[in-house]
Amino acid sequence: MKVRASVRKICKDCRLIRRKRRVMVICSNPKHKQRQG
């Protein structure tokens, strides 16, 4: 899980979602998991 100021999709499988007022990226590749913080 990477914590970044700006999250973006890295590949075509990445999905931008909002969870508990946090913007997150979930993906089939675990290296692409990100959260805004």
Curated annotation (Swiss-Prot):
The keyword Cytoplasm does not apply. It holds the Pfam family Ribosomal_L36. It comes from the Eukaryota. GO terms for molecular function: structural constituent of ribosome. GO terms for cellular component: chloroplast; ribonucleoprotein complex; ribosome. GO terms for biological process: translation. It is found in: Plastid, Chloroplast. PROSITE patterns: RIBOSOMAL_L36. Its main location: plastid. InterPro entries: Ribosomal_bL36 (IPR000473), Ribosomal_bL36_sp (IPR035977). Keywords: Chloroplast, Plastid, Ribonucleoprotein, Ribosomal protein. PANTHER family: 50S RIBOSOMAL PROTEIN L36, CHLOROPLASTIC (PTHR42888), LARGE RIBOSOMAL SUBUNIT PROTEIN BL36C (PTHR42888:SF1). NCBIfam families: rpmJ_bact (TIGR01022). Belongs to the bacterial ribosomal protein bL36 family. This is Large ribosomal subunit protein bL36c. It comes from Oltmannsiellopsis viridis.
